[in-house]
Amino acid sequence: MFKLQTDQGEIQISDTVLSDITGAAATSCYGVKGMAYRSMTDGLVHLLRPTAMSKGVHITQHDEGDISIELHIIVEPGVNMTAISREIISQVRYLVNKNTGARIRSVDVYVDSITL
């Protein structure tokens, strides 16, 4: 739960909402096939459905009120992973801040798989 203090009171935004915004920002970037989830039982990476994107996003709120975001993605073959990662970081920072007012400490992108 992300908490934002304003002059009028406190705003609480669920991790699911932040994850949905983050996942939508990431998957809108060219070359991203989808969000990824690594199964603990078999160790395989799974492509997540759009309704389950939050499993591929990890959000940490720090004591200072800012947040760190980790994204696990699957990309299409033949794309420049560095360029995709930079675009994702830019999109996520912009959209999360625009929609929630959250201060972003860091956005880390993990390319877990390449799929056709």
Task: Describe each PLM feature range.
Residues M1-P77, M81, R86, K98, ...:
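Contiguous, often N-terminal, cationic amphipathic patches that form binding interfaces
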Residues R93:
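Glycine-rich active-site/cofactor-binding loop and its immediate structural neighborhood
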